[in-house]
């Protein structure tokens, strides 16, 4: 009996302690409920804090959980963020056992909240699964923290003059929809450097690198007053890998391939013609496919200029062969005319002693196609019987063909145009590439955003 007494005392003490905790817990919850009831008693959520008096300051900051994708065709981007707003409402001050009241989204509809909207947003979604993704806290001094998880689809104006070596500053603009500057102002909670956070793992872009972000604020005027606009600029630099593989390398290889025709024999007309036409069609196909990933802008981009110059080189190679073929034919015709006037005629005279059978015959040459008729020598008039005797005695005429003059080395060798083209075309194309890449890669192509205030 004496040994069980200490255990009995311990059990009674534990029951007493647990009872006190339960009573304190019930008292705490009842006290918090009483605090909320007192806060909402006589509270009008239609009026902003300090209505008719001081300006309400709304402090904001943004945490980006996912950035991308970015659409060049639609000129827009998408991101998932935690959008936080903090302001002070003197009507919600309280005292009690707790310093912070952590409440759910049901409380949001019962108090005043800023009417913030995204000015350049095309579509914004507030997540509601499994419950509305909202955080709401009230501090003892009346400071309120209101956080929402949003997916924002915003407009990103792009000027693609330097595409694909371009960079863009995609803005996110927000402010009050109804309250002018005289009633609500927005500020950055953590200053201009730390109010927008974008972790490295949050950026999942295929064609861009997110190299940083800057913030600014401005005041705009409208018919209904002056409004404070907060802006975040997300700086994006385009990646070159895709376009080097799909556009630039095929264009360079096509131009080099077109210049191979300068080394093909000028007499191979079908081969060089097919070569030139095929490379021209290839460049046409590349230029069409390059535009598929771009909006229909009215100006030329850096890639358009490169493709245009490559197309000019390929087309010039085809024109070069046309010139070679033309001048080759011209030289051929000149050679034929020279051969016509330089070749001596073949004289054929019968071996008979009679002078009546002399006749000059100029035989046509099969290669130069030169024909000329020579009038036979006049024969004296004789009787038919004598003529028959003469013709019977006349031997068969024999002729010696004219040997055509040999072709000159310049006519049968490589064209001078081809010789010059073998040097000029590669040098010119290499010079163009040198200037093109030095200019664009050393150029600051990032769009300039507004200055930070």
Swiss-Prot record:
Signal peptide: 1-19
Transmembrane regions: 244-264, 271-290, 305-325, 423-443
Glycosylation sites: 31, 128, 141
Positions bearing Phosphothreonine: 403
Annotated catalysed reactions: chloride(in) = chloride(out)
One MF annotation (Gene Ontology) recorded for this entry: GABA-gated chloride ion channel activity
Domain comment quoted from the record: GABAARs subunits share a common topological structure: a peptide sequence made up of a long extracellular N-terminal, four transmembrane domains, intracellular or cytoplasmic domain located between the third and the fourth transmembrane domains.
Protein's name according to its UniProt entry: Gamma-aminobutyric acid receptor subunit alpha-6
Gene name as annotated: GABRA6
């Amino acid at each position: 009996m004496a040994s069980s007494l200490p255990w009995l005392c311990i059990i009674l003490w534990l029951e007493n302690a647990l009872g006190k905790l339960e009573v304190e817990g019930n008292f705490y919850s009842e006290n918090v409920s009483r605090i909320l009831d007192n806060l909402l008693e006589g509270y009008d959520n239609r009026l902003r804090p300090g209505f008719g008096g001081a300006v309400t300051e709304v402090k904001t900051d943004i945490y980006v959980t996912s950035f991308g994708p970015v659409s060049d065709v639609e000129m827009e981007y998408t991101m998932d963020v935690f959008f936080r707003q903090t302001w002070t409402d003197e009507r919600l001050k309280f005292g009690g056992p707790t310093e912070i009241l952590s409440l759910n989204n049901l409380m949001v509809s019962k108090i005043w909240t800023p009417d913030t909207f995204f000015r350049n947003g095309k579509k914004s979604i507030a997540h509601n699964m499994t419950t509305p993704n909202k955080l709401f806290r009230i501090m003892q001094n009346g400071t309120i923290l209101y956080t929402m998880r949003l997916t924002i689809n915003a407009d990103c104006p792009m000027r693609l003059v330097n595409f694909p070596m371009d960079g863009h500053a995609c803005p996110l603009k927000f402010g009050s929809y109804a309250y002018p500057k005289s009633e609500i102002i927005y500020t950055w909670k953590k200053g201009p450097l730390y109010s927008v956070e974008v972790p490295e793992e949050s950026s999942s872009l295929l064609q861009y690198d997110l190299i940083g972000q800057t913030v600014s604020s401005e005041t705009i005027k409208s018919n209904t007053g002056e409004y404070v606009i907060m802006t975040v600029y997300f700086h994006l630099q385009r990646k070159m890998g895709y376009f080097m593989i799909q556009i630039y390398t095929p264009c360079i290889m096509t131009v080099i391939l077109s210049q191979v025709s300068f080394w093909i024999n000028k007499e191979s007309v079908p081969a060089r013609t097919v070569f030139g036409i095929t490379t021209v069609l290839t460049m046409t196909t590349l230029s069409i496919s390059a535009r598929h990933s771009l909006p229909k802008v009215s100006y030329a981009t850096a890639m358009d200029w490169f493709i245009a110059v490559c197309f000019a080189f390929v087309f010039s190679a085809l024109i070069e062969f046309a010139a070679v073929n033309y001048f080759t034919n011209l030289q051929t015709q000149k050679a034929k005319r020279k051969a016509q006037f330089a070749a001596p005629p073949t004289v054929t005279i019968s071996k008979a002693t009679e002078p009546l059978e002399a006749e000059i015959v100029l035989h046509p040459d099969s290669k130069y196609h030169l024909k000329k008729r020579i009038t036979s020598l006049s024969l004296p008039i004789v009787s038919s019987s004598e003529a028959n005797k003469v013709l019977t005695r006349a031997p068969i005429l024999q002729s010696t063909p004219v040997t055509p003059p040999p072709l000159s080395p310049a006519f049968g060798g490589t064209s001078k145009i081809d010789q010059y083209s073998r040097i000029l075309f590669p040098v010119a194309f290499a010079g163009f590439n040198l200037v093109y890449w030095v200019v664009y890669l050393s150029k600051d192509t990032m769009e300039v955003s507004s200055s930070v205030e």
